[in-house]
């Protein structure tokens, strides 16, 4: 087995080698889309942890039973008989 020594070749790159690493428009769009998805995922994870830590703060003060009672009393004018 022969081993080769890789020195600091990044300092010796020519202009053609540097342009070979440039991204196309499709790659830039893909990376931007993945970045936006990662940010969205991070926000969802933070929101889920907030709900897990304090689940009752996000609930409204009225309950479904209160709304059903009002519906049975006929307080909604748009209800069809």
Curated annotation (Swiss-Prot):
Signal peptide, first to last residue: none
Presence of the UniProt keyword Lyase in the record: no
Any one GO CC term of the record: membrane
Subcellular location(s) of the protein: Membrane
Pfam families named among the record's database cross-references: Cortexin (PF11057)
Isomerase as UniProt keyword: no
Membrane topology qualifier: Single-pass membrane protein
Family stated for the protein in its record: Belongs to the cortexin family.
Protein's name in the database: Cortexin-2
Organism for this UniProt entry: Homo sapiens
Gene that encodes the chain: CTXN2
């Amino acid at each position: 087995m022969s081993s080769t020594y890789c020195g600091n070749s990044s300092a010796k790159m020519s202009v053609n080698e540097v342009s070979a690493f440039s991204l196309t428009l499709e790659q830039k769009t893909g990376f931007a889309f993945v970045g936006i998805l990662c940010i969205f995922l991070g926000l969802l994870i933070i929101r889920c942890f907030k709900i897990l830590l304090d689940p009752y703060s996000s609930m409204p003060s009225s309950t479904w039973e209160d709304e059903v009672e009002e519906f049975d009393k006929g307080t909604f004018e748009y209800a069809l008989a």
